[in-house]
Amino acid sequence: MKIYCCLNTVGFFMDGCGVIPPDSKEITAEHWQSLLKSQAEGGVIDFSVFPPSIKEVIRTHDDEVADANFQKQMLISDATDFINSRQWQGKAALGRLKEDELKQYNLWLDYLEALELVDTSSAPDIEWPTPPAVQAR
């Protein structure tokens, strides 16, 4: 199987798989696999040169903070979903929480509060709170 690269179309093409642009050039399967592996690890394929290479991606502090904010919101959402799945808030309002449920509810509320206090501006050096151990129902 031959693999081609087209700098104008910005893509890879394989022999026998559709139309190959006339300005394409052949690359080795090893080089193609190396590019795809590097791309999967976060690299960016640079089609401005032949053969294509991997551009070094330099993450900024703003990128790290954005990732941390996303992580924080996901953890808060997961914790809230877990609390809601146990119906602790409704049971508490009706005075129907058992002692062990009340302890777990408070642990999860403490965890949510700790998540809210996480300062994402220090990303990527964040010490995330640990969620409480989940007890079987």
UniProtKB/Swiss-Prot annotation:
InterPro entries for this protein: Phage_T4_Gp38_tail_assem, TFA_Chaperone
Top-level taxon of the source organism: Bacteria
PANTHER family in the record: CYTOPLASMIC PROTEIN, PROPHAGE TAIL FIBER ASSEMBLY PROTEIN HOMOLOG TFAE-RELATED-RELATED
Entry's family note: To E.coli YfdK.
Protein name, as recorded: Uncharacterized protein YmfS
Organism field: Escherichia coli (strain K12)
Gene that this sequence comes from: ymfS
